[in-house]
Swiss-Prot record:
Its main location: nucleus. Residues 435-451 have a biased composition (Polar residues). GO terms for molecular function: cyclin binding; transcription coactivator activity. PANTHER family: MEDIATOR OF RNA POLYMERASE II TRANSCRIPTION SUBUNIT 13. This is Mediator of RNA polymerase II transcription subunit 13. It comes from Eremothecium gossypii (strain ATCC 10895 / CBS 109.51 / FGSC 9923 / NRRL Y-1056) (Yeast). Belongs to the Mediator complex subunit 13 family. It comes from the Eukaryota. It is found in: Nucleus. The keyword Nucleus applies. The lineage of its organism: Eukaryota, Fungi, Dikarya, Ascomycota, Saccharomycotina. Residues 356-391, 420-487 are annotated as: Disordered.
């Protein structure tokens, strides 16, 4: 049955839009305060909302805007008690036919006022089940389950004022008292209604609960009036002290790779606990069962094990002057991996992983007393020959032989020679740990345990040579008998360490914790023993050891208690009298124990503080008139990578890239005055010399808002702020909204440091809210509470600035010169993996359609505030819906080039299809730490299938005679092991590849599936090998292929899986632009005659199309891009680390454009670049760079589109008959019987590859840009495998500009282009099934960013 046998009825498509009003015009009036510091606008908005919650009013920067629809009256702010209203600056109206793509300022503010009005009435009617949260609402189904509901408004050109409803599950839960009890899970906290990121000041949430502030009633009433949140009658309302994220308050999304880290500031805010929500990290796993506690009697055994560990750390490592030869203990061939040849490569960290395996998770969680006894019984007896001479020279070994046996039972590798890293063929007891990425990266001596991710740092210099801290213990009592004398407690550094840890149970002193933390009561044997130092190493040749048996042991000197590294400082006595005491006490690091830590105090400026998340930093074109001509060029060169502007929170809505007026290009750049901010860095001084101590930490960015001219919320508490309006505030305003939290016994101190202007600021800050309460007043006392909540009532962060998914533990990469090559390797592994690596458990949630009840809160509320409420159907918003045919791809069969439909990919192994552009051969080498038969069969079968499918030839490399072909078994993946392996690869390549064509060597490395850390670690291991080999043989090409470890352990693997893996290897081999298949050229259905007459800009035909998709992480740390042409013959992926640096971002943009121009140079004729910005957003700083770069290339025509697979607009399918496969899912009896003699008349169709194009009647607003609208909107849609009644898969495409006059034709061309290259997902081994309706280059960028955004880049200092 043909999929197009029936016609599709647009009436059966339900959209997520609901018509609420029929608009002819929208009236508006703008009020501007008389002075920049006037709070009249804030007071007026609250009073209007108190009088009428349905009023359409909004704050925008320093202005108050009032709106009405059609003939309704404008809400007037002329009310008593708030002073004389200022003159209206602007009054007028606009119609639905507003300009695009840049929305006029009144329309954008109208949408904001509409959304605020909907939120307030929803919350009032729902009895706080719907709580405003940023620019959205949180619907609480119960105490733990909740979802986010969006109410987005849009005015169509036909006058339909609509509200779009959608929901998204981001895992928000209401903060409860027991949320942080027990083992701490690093959850993210947020404040409602602002959506600001916050932190707990103490790990125990019970310590964060505080008494209500004295102006609590004022705050609750303000919440009721401004947001509809009614907590005034709440019983047992709890108040909690939280630390807000000031960066997020100012528009910066906290770095997602460090999202779970604690705040760097101690300034706090007191907030109702019912308005606090938590978000759990994706990798949080709550263990309901605890491991069996170790018996107390094992303490002595662990002491003996520790003695033996220290013995091995030093005695196996020889130093000059020792009596034992360096190769005696190992006796290995210097040419083999792990022999004496490794001494030149071995740093001290080599011994960490191999000899300390009892620190791993197995020794803590698996080693119960009963299991330890079972292992001891089953252990084979060991002879003295098992140890090298280096071990036997150490005294007291025989006394500790029991611990030696225990150590070998627990960790068999601990008794092996440290240099025997390769030739050991034994399989580890825990094969997962053998490839665990906990091995050190580079030369760092870090051991990460599996379950608790704890680090143990071993300083070998101290253990080997003995530093100044160990001199007093060097000749101490080394007898084991002292360990049994529990009354002996020698004063050591470890005692103070344990004291600090005991006083800090949450691990603040030692953030990473200790490697072993056994909960025992008998921990008295704390003396450190030096049994591991051989006699010939601790004696000098000229001074023989004194061996008088009657001589007493040296008396150890007690150690001094640890002191601060900063204070007190010791100075030369000659100058000590001239040194100021503050330097002796540590300077800025000094701390007075009598000082009082108090919550952060905010003050609010009405100059550019708004209740919008998009327009808090509005500025006008007049701001640029004051710029001096000599500074204009410097400001132009400055990037507008602002926190608010990046995601359109501070974009000037009334100005946008006027192409005709070059002077107006400066509107892209903000020119904020420093006085138009609220200063968080200025706090009242306590003493004159301690002013700087209490400053809030600077924003941890290279481009601070001060440097790029951004508005920052900072409470100016020194009286120099914007709120100093003495004449406007009378003595009757007695609110205490900004005073510090009182502390018992500190009244006099607070009085001394409270300035006169601080009192005035406190009074006028509360006046904005106290005016809505009526007669409510708060007497001014000498000690007053802090109610620093006004900024969290005025700011509303967009949900887009909050990550959908974050992790509590993130992999780390070093930001150095090698990072670019590392990212290139990593991107290829992430993109062309055919889904083998998994989704890393970081799949973001998607928007879903909302099904409304007939008598639900949403329907009743919208019916009460609007004149109508009717859902729009497809025929009302869609102008055209058309079927897009599948493209044909080029492949080879029996040596001939053929064309076949793109959905035939699943039959490729059965049809014996070959690559269209020739074979690629390679040499293979699989590295593992475990020798199993499945690993041998896996690599052998892989090589056989690759050659049998005629993809090329695969030669399995054999480095040594005793190895299997293509398989190397390593003892570990430590640095020294890999360096030695690199030396053997160099030897092999120089011997076997001199007179042969340069065939690349592909190294296969096993990784744990869906493991971020394993992927990063193994990629870094390969980069180490690659750099080492290419430093000696630059012409050798090394490639990487990560293989999931489960795949190598599976003895039964389907041939199809092998074939998919082989085709993925083919796509990775050079030349990388040559893939298995490409789009075939089709003959045109009609011939078009084009002449050169007329304006070239009006020509709508292009000879070639280049597609560039890119996205930038919401924290501005990473940038990813992918290139493709319309046939897929040109393809490339790349990523950059930005680190929130404007210089790096500009460099990345320049490089990105350079690569695009190079690709365009290989094309001919008129070329159109389809610049695709993902996430349905286009920040101004990015657009500025594209405009700057596009003018440098005249033969490259730029078309900018914003796309999104998960947007707030959804289409619900109710058609039961189209496409024709729907009846088959409903009832299989509708299927026709297949006629065996007419098989040639049938056609096999993959319904996952059947796509339709949609063109909307009116352009849609960008989902995450409130001030920008498309000039034409469309989508690629796919029907799901069901009988109907489900949401369509939709890939939304919004065209922002058109190089010619026919935007509809260009949009349809782009939809056809996207459909064609979307069919390459499976052929390029990028995606299978799920994302086949999305172009491959968009899917590639999405896969890169989904992973790399959780990687923590560490700058080298």
């Amino acid at each position: 049955m043909d999929i197009l046998e029936t016609s599709f009825r647009l009436e059966d498509v339900l959209s997520s839009y609901y018509r609420v009003e029929k608009v002819v015009r929208v009236n508006y009036q703008q009020f501007v305060p008389r002075t920049p510091d006037d709070q009249w606008c804030i007071q007026s908005e609250l009073l209007i909302r108190k009088k009428d919650p349905k009023a359409l009013v909004a704050l925008f920067s320093r202005e108050l805007w009032c709106f009405s629809i059609n003939d309704q009256d404008l809400p007037m702010p002329g009310l008593e008690g708030i002073g004389e209203p200022p003159n209206s600056e602007k009054k007028g109206h606009f119609t639905p036919g507003f300009s695009k793509p840049n929305l006029p300022t009144p329309y954008a503010i109208f949408l904001k006022a509409l959304r605020r009005m909907i939120h307030i009435n929803m919350c009032l009617r729902s009895q706080n089940r719907l709580v405003p949260f940023g620019n959205t609402c949180i619907f609480q189904r119960d105490e733990k389950a909740s979802s986010v509901i969006h109410f987005d408004s849009h005015l169509f050109e036909n006058g339909d004022l609509t509200v779009s409803l959608c929901t998204k599950d981001m895992g928000f839960e209401r903060l409860l008292s027991g949320a942080f009890t027990g083992r701490q899970v690093k959850r993210a906290l947020y404040l409602a209604p602002s959506g600001i990121r916050a932190y707990l000041p103490f790990p125990d949430i019970s310590k964060c609960l505080v008494a209500p502030p004295k102006n609590a009633h004022l705050l609750l009433v303000t919440l009721l009036v401004s947001h509809g949140i009614d907590l005034t009658q709440a019983k047992d309302l709890k108040w909690i002290k939280l630390v807000p994220n000031i960066n997020h308050l100012n528009g910066y999304t906290p770095t997602i790779s460090r999202y779970a880290e604690e705040s760097q500031t101690s300034k706090s805010v007191i907030w109702p606990m019912d308005l606090c929500f938590q978000q759990t990290p994706a990798d949080a796993c709550v263990n309901t069962t605890r491991a069996t506690p170790l018996d107390i009697g094992l303490q002595d055994s662990f002491d003996l094990i520790e003695d033996f560990i220290q013995l091995k750390l030093t005695s196996a490592y020889r130093i000059p002057g020792t009596s034992v030869n360096a190769n005696t203990a190992t006796g290995n061939n210097p040419l083999s991996t792990g022999g004496g040849f490794t001494d030149q490569f071995q740093p001290f960290v080599k011994h960490t992983n191999s000899s300390s395996c009892n620190y791993g998770p197995a020794s803590r969680t698996k080693l119960t007393p009963s299991k330890a006894q079972d292992l001891r019984r089953s252990a084979a007896p060991l002879s003295a020959d098992s140890f090298g001479n280096g071990f036997m020279t150490t005294p007291n070994v025989n006394e500790n032989m029991g611990s030696v046996i225990d150590d070998m039972v627990i960790c068999p590798s601990s008794v092996k020679s440290q240099n025997d890293l390769w030739n050991d063929r034994k399989s580890s007891n825990d094969d997962i740990d053998s490839i665990n990425p906990t091995s050190q990266q580079g030369d760092s001596a870090r051991i990460t345990s599996g379950s608790e991710e704890q680090d143990v740092e071993v300083t070998f210099d101290k253990d080997l040579f003995g530093d100044e801290d160990d001199e007093s213990d060097l000749f101490g009592d080394s007898s084991n008998k002292s360990t049994h004398r529990k009354e002996v407690r020698e004063i050591t550094d470890e005692m103070f360490d344990s004291a600090e840890i005991e006083s800090d149970p949450e691990g603040k002193i030692t953030p990473t914790g200790t490697s072993i933390n056994y909960s025992t009561q008998q921990q008295t044997p704390l003396k450190r023993k030096y049994l591991d130092i051989p006699l010939d190493e601790i004696t000098l040749p000229a001074a023989p050891l004194y061996t008088d048996p009657g001589a007493p042991l040296p008396v150890e000197t007690p150690r001094d208690r640890r002191k601060s590294v900063f204070a007190p400082l010791n100075f030369n006595p000659m100058i000590e009298s001239n040194v100021d005491n503050k330097y002796k006490n540590g300077g800025k690091f000094s701390f007075d124990p009598n000082e009082i830590d108090e919550p952060l105090k905010f003050e609010v400026s009405t100059t550019n503080i708004s209740s919008s998340e998009e327009d808090d930093s509005e500025f006008s074109g007049d701001d640029f008139d004051e710029l001096q001509q000599n500074n204009l060029q410097d400001i132009r060169a400055m990037e507008v990578g602002s926190s608010l502007q990046q995601y359109d929170m501070g974009r000037p809505i009334n100005e946008f890239l006027n192409q005709s007026d070059s002077a107006k290009e400066d509107y892209l750049l903000p020119a904020y005055q420093s006085g138009d901010v609220i200063d968080v860095d200025k706090f009242p001084s306590r003493e004159s010399h301690l002013d700087q101590i209490w400053k809030s930490p600077e924003i941890n960015r290279e481009d601070t808002p001060h440097r790029i001219g951004l508005p920052i919320i900072k409470p100016q508490l020194d009286g120099s702020g914007n709120l100093d309006i003495d004449n406007q505030i009378t003595d009757n305003c007695s609110s205490n909204y900004y005073e510090p939290t009182p502390v018992v016994g500190a009244d006099e101190k607070i009085q001394e440091r409270t300035l006169h202007k601080d009192k005035k600021l406190d009074q006028q800050g509360d006046s904005a809210m106290a005016s809505v309460v009526g007669d409510y007043s708060l007497a001014i006392k000498e000690t007053r509470e802090s109610s620093n909540g006004l900024p969290f009532l005025l700011r509303h962060m967009p949900l887009f600035s909050i990550p959908d998914v974050f992790l509590s533990k993130n992999p780390i990469v070093k930001v150095d010169s090698k990072l670019e090559d590392f990212l290139e390797i990593l991107c290829e592994q992430l993109v062309f993996d055919q889904g083998f690596l998994g989704n890393f458990d970081v799949d973001p949630p998607t928007y879903k359609d909302v099904k409304l009840n007939e008598k639900g809160v949403i329907r009743e509320t919208l019916n009460s505030v609007f004149s109508e409420f009717e859902r729009l159907r497809g025929n009302e918003i869609i102008s055209d819906m058309f079927y897009i045919k599948q493209p044909s791809v080029c492949v080879k069969k029996h040596g001939n080039l053929i064309k076949l439909k793109s959905d035939a990919e699943s039959f490729a192994p059965l049809l014996h299809l070959k690559p269209s552009r020739g074979m690629k051969s390679f040499r293979g080498l699989f590295l593992t730490t475990i020798l199993t038969q499945t690993c041998v069969s896996f690599i052998t079968e892989l090589a056989h299938i690759y050659s049998a499918q005629e993809l090329g030839f695969c030669e399995l490399v054999k480095l040594t005679n005793d190895e299997h072909n293509g398989l190397i078994v390593l003892n570990n993946f430590n640095t020294d092991t890999l360096l030695l392996l690199s030396a053997q690869i160099v030897s092999y390549c120089s011997t076997n590849m001199n007179n042969v064509k340069n065939i690349p060597l592909m190294i296969f490395l096993p990784v744990a599936p869906s493991s971020l850390e394993a992927t990063i670690t193994m990629t870094s291991k390969f980069q180490l090998i690659k750099n080492e080999v290419k430093s000696r043989l630059p012409d050798v090409e090394l490639l990487l292929k990560l293989i999931p470890f489960d795949l190598t352990k599976d003895p039964v693997i389907m041939i199809d899986r092998y074939y998919e893996l082989c085709r993925g290897i083919y796509n990775l081999l050079p030349p990388r632009t040559v893939k298995f298949a490409s789009i075939a050229d089709n003959l045109p259905e009609q011939v078009e005659f084009r002449t050169s007459a007329g304006n070239q800009n009006q020509l709508s035909h292009y000879d070639s199309y280049i597609h560039l998709a890119y996205t930038r992480s919401i924290d501005r740390e990473w940038l990813a891009a992918a290139w493709s042409d319309s046939k897929g013959t040109e393809n490339m992926v790349k990523a950059w680390y930005l680190g929130n640096s404007k210089a790096r971002f500009e460099t990345a943009c320049n490089e990105l454009w350079k690569l695009t121009v190079e690709l365009a140079s290989r094309k001919y004729g008129r070329i159109c670049l389809i610049l695709t910005r993902m996430d349905s957003v286009l920040p101004d700083d990015e657009l500025m760079h594209w405009r700057r770069l596009s003018v440098t290339t005249r033969n490259l025509h730029l078309a900018v589109v914003c796309v999104g697979a998960s947007t707030k607009v959804s289409l619900y399918d109710e058609d039961q008959f189209y496409p024709s496969f729907k009846p088959l899912f409903k009832d299989k009896r509708y299927a026709n019987k297949i006629q065996a003699n007419q098989l040639d008349d049938y056609e096999v169709v993959n319904i996952d590859e059947e796509l339709h194009g949609v063109v909307f009647s009116s352009p849609l607003q960008l989902a995450n840009s409130q001030h920008r609208c498309a000039i034409k909107s469309g989508a690629l849609v796919r029907f799901k495998r069901c009988a109907g009644g489900d949401t369509l898969d939709k890939f939304e495409v919004n065209l922002l500009n058109c190089p010619h006059s026919d935007s509809t034709k260009l949009l349809k061309t782009i939809l056809h282009q996207f459909r064609d290259i979307a069919s390459l997902n499976t052929w390029f081994c990028i995606s299978r099934g799920k994302d086949n309706y999305i172009p491959w280059h968009v899917v590639a960028v999405k896969k890169i960013m989904r992973f790399i955004i959780h990687v923590n880049g560490i700058e080298e200092k």
